Amino acid sequence: MSSNFKIEYINENNYNRIFVTSDIHGYYNLFEKLLNKINLQKDDLLIILGDSCDRGENSIELYLKYIELQEQGYQVKHIWGNHEDMLYESAFISFYYKDLWYKVGGDETVYNYEQYIKKNYWKG
């Protein structure tokens, strides 16, 4: 388990509305529907309680969308869930976690990253 632990105080008075969601699991289209449904504004806060990767086909696109929204001035906070933790552990700590991670959808995330790299960076 990663050891980067941080408690952050959020003053709800600093935002017009606060939305909380979780377990998007690579389903980019569902996230887009959520954004359209709530009509996210720059004075709102969107908190994503992790598990943005695995299972669905667009994990990397979700993370890139979060970054894009932040760069555009939207208030988006993403908290690591157990799937992000398994991704990190299997990639950087121990192969023990790789089998477990693949069983819960990590194989889809690896495939998604491979396809993204081939599409955007592969010149061969």
Predicted feature residues:
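Active-site neighborhood of divalent metal-dependent phosphoester bond hydrolases
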Residues: 55-124
